[in-house]
């Protein structure tokens, strides 16, 4: 997390709430603060469980709706991974792509200028103007790849 404790993101969210004439609430602030403290990709249920430790009265629907507001405010990005939505911090983050483990669900971020250059080159060659992309590579993380296959484990 940034050294300012997410202060700038909190200001952006407060401005978004005011601009859209939405209600400021303690529940939304707890959800935002909890989200900003995380360094991983969270499902609604993941975030709800973390929020429940601080405020058991906050429901899953409130967490979901607040995540959608964070997304609309440019603070969170929703990723569809293996049929489940996960959210990550987006505000002022450099572009990156994802390796996703199909066994344990671990998500590893990476950035590679060469991949970006090749994509741009291919797009230019066919006259395509890239406005954005999401690159997700599915496979096995180091830990899962090192495990023996289940068939061999039973022998």
Predicted region positions:
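Short, Lys/Arg-enriched N-terminal segment that forms or immediately precedes the first helix
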Residues: 9-21
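Short, leucine-enriched amphipathic alpha-helices that occur as contiguous helical runs
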Residues: 10, 27-28
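Short capping segments at the starts of secondary-structure elements
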Residues: 26, 37-43
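Pre-recognition alpha-helix immediately N-terminal to the DNA-recognition helix
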Residues: 29-34
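A short acidic, leucine-rich amphipathic alpha-helix
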Residues: 46-52, 63
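Non-DNA-binding regulatory cores of transcription-related proteins
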Residues: 72-155
